[in-house]
Amino acid sequence: MLTGCGASSPTPPEQPQLSAPVNLPFDLAVNVFSSYLSQTAEQACFAASSQGQCRNDGIASNEFLAGLEQLSLFRELSPSVSRHDYELLIANQLTETPATQQGSTKDQPLQSFSEFSVEWRGVQLDSFLVHYWHQDKVTPQDIQQIILRWAAHAEQQHLFTTPYLYKAMGASDYSGQLVLPQTLGKFRLSQQYLYPDPFKGVLARYLHPEFTDAIVDIAVYPVLAPLTHNSAQQVIHELEDAVEQAKTIAAERAMNIDIKKHQHPISDDTGNIHGMMSELAAEGDDSEALYASIYLFRLEDKFVKFSTTFPSRIGDPLVIQALRELTVPGESALMKELRQAL
């Protein structure tokens, strides 16, 4: 398709040749789709063409895909099929020459404008335009150089990291606004894991210095429903889901599960925070009983779930201490917008 309007081309600049990365820069799977240039990018192409003519997909989508495969930037590529959360959309236009409309002339070298857009489940996180000059024709090496320029931008901006995803989506800032106790009794905060999904939030794990099997997990994640819904019912439903997951795991391990307490009320030491808990024990034919206590609360617009590997008589005071010291982020822009649409 030809479109028109534009001005004379400037003198070609020097274009440093970038080297392909030695190690895998983006250790994830991504969908790859062909797309269309944004209006701003189209205008840049028209302005660069002395004849005001630019051709959509001047570099074919399969050529970009071949370049991505040769450079091995991602763990896996899924062309034209939505299998993964991340998507890479590539749009391209090529300036046309006045004589042949096919390649370069001495006075009119080819220029390409390639726009790379990164999306997560259909939400755009970033867009970057690569302007590249070609001698005589577009070569596979040219295409790799175009891709490498975008990849350098992606690495510099940390596009495929979880913190970038949360910030770009307008999700809660767990790193800056979540306050966790450093210790719970003799348990110490061992690690804090931010899920690569803003709807799953964060998990903090506490370990005991003497008993390696003793674990306390605190998960904080948004309530995926309007806040006008009954809070107590939301907590009960979420706890029931957690208990069902525990039952499934026990069944997979051929273990019998015994529910010691179920949907048992629990409050903090001020009586202002109310939640529910369940205590379970699982036992196999040739193993000792395994205990799990699960506690569910709603603070701000978040569920706070405590999971322990021991009975509630040990877990209750630890949970009450944690509630005393815990502060969760308020409602994020992402969840506010989502709840308005529900």
Question: Each PLM stretch: what is its role?
Answer:
Residues 2-4:
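C-terminal motif of bacterial Sec signal peptides marking the signal peptidase cleavage site
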Residues 10-62, 152-205, 210-212, 258, ...:
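N-terminal "mature-domain start" segment
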Residues 50-52, 203-241:
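A short acidic-to-branched-hydrophobic micro-motif
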Residues 70-84:
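Short acidic low-complexity segments
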Residues 84-87, 91-111, 248-293:
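Signature of long, low-cysteine stretches enriched in small and polar/charged residues
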Residues 88-138, 294, 298-299:
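Amphipathic beta-strand/beta-sheet edge segments enriched in Tyr/Trp
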Residues 123-125, 211-214, 286-289, 298-305:
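Coil-to-beta-strand transition motifs
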Residues 132-158, 304-342:
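Surface-exposed amphipathic alpha-helical segments
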